Amino acid sequence: MAKRDYYEILGVSKSATPEEIKAAFRKLAKEHHPDRNKSADDTLFKEINEAYEVLSDSKKRAQYDQFGHDGPQGFSSASGFSGFSGGFGGVDFDINDIFGSFFNNASSSHNSSNQYETYDIHLRLHLDFMEAVNGISKNINYDRKITCHKCQGTGAKDPKDVKICTKCHGRGTSIENVHSLFGTIQQEVECHECEGTGKVASSKCEQCYGKKVINERVNLTVEIPAGTREGEKLLVSKKGNIVNNQEFDLYLHISVKPSKYFALDGLDIYSETYIDPIKAIVGGIIEVVTINGIKTIEIPSNTPEGKKFRISGSGIVNKKSNIFGKKNGDFYTTIRYAKPVELSKDEIAYLKNISTRTNQNVEYYKNKVLKEISK
């Protein structure tokens, strides 16, 4: 049976941020977990965990986006395994499902940093081409979670109503039996009753309704440095969610709107410059519009259309130049012939006189064609 698409299983788009994927997983995991839903489908619950295990890991997600279920799923060379399916009575499985899910989940229950990663906020920021090139101060608005001031993050109406979780006995984790090809294996996971805190509240705070956090609208000005490029991730420290009085980070994922007139290749910029054909013949100084304004360059006489010229150091700012000593990118422009301006009778007569001269390049090409048709 063909495996379902991981994005479809979690109900998210292929462009979903890590935060959106985490939120979708938590919602589905609670809804379909056997401890909370006695009629839960074990197969669906396994699919949900499998999908999240891949999509929550940037390397595995990239490989899945490229290869799908048939390709590698992000195993490191140290693991000694490569993804495979079949071979045991027609049962499809991935070796990572058997080993990785146990050890990864077990370790995450003891490693609070995995939990805290979910409190970072990821936003997509759209920039115009020149905003990215020159840098800009950008105002952004977004929602974040902060610790409820009324209950101080307990979720309870009264601090006395906060009790030790009876399911995990305050550990924040519980043991589950997982059935595999190798038998039943015990797996330590986050307690679903107290969500890993080890405590539950018998009453609900009147402000946060037991959620322990409240929403806050943030208006923030961020500085986008010159030379910011498509696909970059900018860190804004301590501007994410605030949970248990700990400030988490905001990540801005950059999208740059393409320019109509400039093309990027690394730090280099490419453009086209239109000149009068007469100027191309006689040569001289021409003006080139760059991202830094107008620059002048000198072209030789008889400059052909398509000739490329370079203006050194006039490309994208290299933000790492102070560290590695690398120069900025270069600016390249390709010559294009503009439609000639209207000429006077005397100018036309002068050009007609010149045009009667034999051009060896024209004759050479004509003779090549004649040779072809005379075969």
Swiss-Prot record:
Cofactor section: Zn(2+)
Main location: cytoplasm
SMART domains: DnaJ
CXXCXGXG motif repeats: 148-155, 165-172, 191-198, 205-212
Binding site for Zn(2+) 1: 148, 151, 205, 208
Species of provenance: Ureaplasma parvum serovar 3 (strain ATCC 700970)
Upper classification of the organism: Bacteria, Bacillati, Mycoplasmatota, Mycoplasmoidales, Mycoplasmoidaceae
Binding locations of Zn(2+) 2: 165, 168, 191, 194
Protein task: Participates actively in the response to hyperosmotic and heat shock by preventing the aggregation of stress-denatured proteins and by disaggregating proteins, also in an autonomous, DnaK-independent fashion. Unfolded proteins bind initially to DnaJ; upon interaction with the DnaJ-bound protein, DnaK hydrolyzes its bound ATP, resulting in the formation of a stable complex. GrpE releases ADP from DnaK; ATP binding to DnaK triggers the release of the substrate protein, thus completing the reaction cycle.
Name the record gives this protein: Chaperone protein DnaJ
Record PROSITE patterns: DNAJ_1, DNAJ_2, ZF_CR
The record's free-text note on cofactor binding: Binds 2 Zn(2+) ions per monomer.
Entry's free-text remark on domains: The J domain is necessary and sufficient to stimulate DnaK ATPase activity. Zinc center 1 plays an important role in the autonomous, DnaK-independent chaperone activity of DnaJ. Zinc center 2 is essential for interaction with DnaK and for DnaJ activity.
Alphabetized UniProt keyword annotations: Chaperone, Cytoplasm, DNA replication, Metal-binding, Repeat, Stress response, Zinc, Zinc-finger
Gene name in the database record: dnaJ
GO CC aspect terms: cytoplasm
First and last residues of each zinc finger (CR-type): 135-217
InterPro entries with a match to the protein in the record: DnaJ, DnaJ_C, DnaJ_domain, DnaJ_domain_CS, HSP40/DnaJ_pept-bd, HSP_DnaJ_Cys-rich_dom, HSP_DnaJ_Cys-rich_dom_sf, J_dom_sf
Location relative to the cell: Cytoplasm
